[in-house]
Amino acid sequence: SSRGKRHAENLTPQIEFVLEQARISMDEISVVAVDVGPGLYTGLRVGITTAVSVAFGLGVPMIGVTSLDLLAYPVRYCSKLIVATIDARRGEVFHANYLQVPGGVQRVSEPAVSTPDDLAADLLAHGDEALLVGDGALRYSETFAVLRGVDAAEPNIAYPSADSIVQLAHAKALREEFVTPTELE
């Protein structure tokens, strides 16, 4: 896809820009973190392949963080059920549920894919107050807007952020929760 091609073309310059902004060189990197999805296939493959190449080239371990975890983390102070959503295209959303815990969020459901209507029905059936975050919530806002006690997070946090991956990957690195390239395929 053209979007995947743009991602491939922009990724290396973006890495160089971040290194420059942080005033560090590539050889100062001790671990490589990567968003492992769910998400659109081409963009994920480009990101994962780049991360594997960098980690292999530097001889450092890797950490994988899911996109849904990355979406839930910025709203970690919310006391409601947090539902991270990603537009899966074709009228579906990837989603997982989270609860606030000391220091972050804990996933309380396995990542799943369903139609927005099915997700809305599940939320209605459980009756919990919830905060929806992610581009799936934005894309299908009309489906979720009618649910009582269900709010949408601000659009500015609808996509995984570099800040979140740094925070979550750092915690995983301290616990030595490393992954191998074959685990990411």
Q: Which residue stretches match the model-derived regions?
A:
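N-terminal beta-alpha supersecondary unit
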Residues: 1-38
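DPxDG-like acidic metal-binding loop motif
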Residues: 34-62
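Stable alpha-helical structural segments in soluble proteins, enriched in small hydrophobic residues
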Residues: 18-22, 57, 75, 162-173
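Acidic, glycine-enriched active-site microenvironments
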Residues: 25-30, 109, 152, 175
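Surface "functional belts" at beta-alpha junctions
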Residues: 61-160
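Acyltransferase
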Residues: 153-185
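Phosphate-handling active-site elements
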Residues: 21-27, 56-65, 178
